[in-house]
Amino acid sequence: MNIELDKAIARFQEQNKNFAVKYMNENGEMPMLVAFLTQDDNKEFVTVAAPQLAALHTQEDKPRFIAAVKQAIQVVKPVALAFITEAWIIKRKKDEHIDTNIRPSLSPDRAEVVMVQIESYKNAALHLYDIIRHTSGEISLEYDEEYSNEKIDKSDVDGTFSNLLKENYDKFYREILDSINKNQN
């Protein structure tokens, strides 16, 4: 465990939550966005935003999106990743059955949310903001405390956009720790 790295990940998580809320409030919609936490040449932690991939709307676009993110991971070498989007989801507890033949956007039990999903070397976090659309055309966001979770065991996380860093955790984490330890000595 490294306190400097853990603090950087906590800041990254807060920055992405704040960005998502501000962006949605100002624009009324949220495209698919990905941000990475990595180190720059000076060994400072920085956030690198992936190019906006908002044009990817369809079910068929998802594999292309994931492939692009995985390619970016190889270049950026992040220790944390944020996936932010506006989405239709079906809220459920882990042990509840869900009909995977029905897309969330077509389910009668769907919820419209802004989702901020954070993945790091040691755990995942999920923050959901219910989108409330008023008859005036205005929107408001309400944080969903029941389904949001700051620290989720990565083995409990599933979904199309989950565990994208999985193949690189140990390698990138070890590189970052070595770099931090060299700078502290």
Predicted regions located by residue number:
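N-terminal domain-onset segments
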Residues: 1-64
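Low-complexity intrinsically disordered segments
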Residues: 66-185
